Amino acid sequence: MKRILVAATIGAASVVVLAPGIAHAGEAGYLARISVDYGLDIYDEREALALGYAVCDELRAGKPREVVADRMFLKVLDMTRTHADGIAFSAQRELCPETAQ
């Protein structure tokens, strides 16, 4: 599994990564999805969640998920299209499902 540290510049920049901690159901689902389904190693849960919630802020502001993912892909060094799409999808599905159409 490729180790990846993703610095995102969506709103307030954050990093994708996983450390031990307690997460709520939606948060745990988000962390599991980006780790298991999209192969991201998570070193810091708080930063990974901050990135997910930054995605949700963009979605709530009316930006389409594809646009949010494109911005991550284009702005973050070593971000793959699959990772960007996966982070945006996982955040929408698990952290802010009310933004799905």
Residue ranges, per PLM feature:
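N-terminal alpha-helical segment
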Residues: 27, 48-51, 68
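Cleaved targeting-peptide boundary
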Residues: 25-34
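Acidic/histidine-rich, surface-exposed loop or edge segments in extracytoplasmic proteins
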Residues: 33-36, 68
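Alpha-helix C-capping/helix-to-loop hinge sites
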Residues: 37, 41, 55-58, 75-76
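Short, surface-exposed acidic
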Residues: 39-48, 79-84
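Compact alpha-helical subdomains of small soluble proteins
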Residues: 63-101
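Classic N-terminal secretory signal peptides
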Residues: 1-25
